[in-house]
Amino acid sequence: MKPPLKKIVLQSFREILVGGKTFTALGSQVLSLAEVKNYPMICLGRETMTYQFYSQFFLKHCLELTPDTEVATTDQILPLVKNELGLAFLPEKIAEEAIARHEIVQIALQDPVPERQICMVYDVEHSLNAPTRQLKNLILGGSVEPEKSVDIRVYKK
């Protein structure tokens, strides 16, 4: 990163491959990405960084990412998986409750998905505005200062 820009890692996370109940048998197997391509895939749209990430991940294994269904937001993926429309990569935190309820199944991969990060890039020559500071604090696990609070709504599923 070139000065005066600075990058702060706000959060790291892992994504896992999941499928609906009809894919339960796959939950006891370890699949290669080539085998995953034999099943319908659900993915975020081509204009997203997530799509680019998985496109590169597949290319590193000499494969092309060819999802059957593309969606606009991550929260649209889980209902499609639950309704048996295909396999998908989801952040562990989003998938864990549905896995615990046996609504979906986690599918192991021979080559695990690399860890991802949520980063904030900012210009060190300019101070962060109040909403940006508050969002940064929330993501880093801090709290919003009451006297300086702003209207930030964070929705968790």
Regions from the PLM with identified roles:
Residues 25-26, 40-61, 128-130, 136, ...:
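Secondary-structure junction motif
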Residues 17-18, 41, 106, 120, ...:
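Generic preference for hydrophobic
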Residues 3-41:
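Flexible hinge/capping segments at coil-to-helix
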Residues 1-3, 71, 153-157:
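Central regulatory/effector-binding core of bacterial HTH transcription factors
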Residues 92-101, 111-157:
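C-terminal effector-binding regulatory domain of bacterial HTH transcription factors
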Residues 6-16, 101-114:
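Short beta-strand->loop
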Residues 20, 44-45, 67, 90:
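Thr-Gly-centered strand-to-loop micro-motif
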Residues 50-107:
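Hydrophobic hinge/microswitch elements
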